[in-house]
Amino acid sequence: MNVVIIGLGAIGRMIVDGVAGDESPVRLAGVAVRPARAEEARAELVSDIAVFTSPEEIVAARPDMVVECAGQAALRQYGEALLSSGLDLMVVATGALADGDYRARLLAAAEKGGARLHVPAGATAGLDGLGALK
């Protein structure tokens, strides 16, 4: 399973470290960061991990799953575009879903794209959420 994560903070790094190695069924295909952090991210990651700075770049890569682990602002920036393009999205910033209007927009985008919106149990799914995808 090819996965792209949004965010390279504490949770994102935990996922990067957790999927490293041959034993993992998950392949980290890329990481999305703010444009100002792109070069820094490229220097930190192994060369076969792409660095993205926009939803359009992720859509073009066609991963099997995108995992948002950068907070509500990132979810609002990426969520609807990814789902409406047919990409499954796991949301770690579940607090954003408390906004009923926004939640409805995400669900409509998922329906439009034939995608799934995954909301893992607990405040932070991290590696446990990815492990459930096996």
Label each residue range with its predicted role.
Residues G12-R13:
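N-terminal Rossmann-fold NAD(P) dinucleotide-binding loop
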Residues D22-E44:
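NAD(P)-binding Rossmann-fold cofactor-contacting core
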Residues T53-S84, A96-G100:
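Beta-loop-alpha module in the N-terminal Rossmann-like domain of NAD(P)-dependent dehydrogenases
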Residues A115-K134:
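Conserved anion/nucleotide-ligand pocket segment
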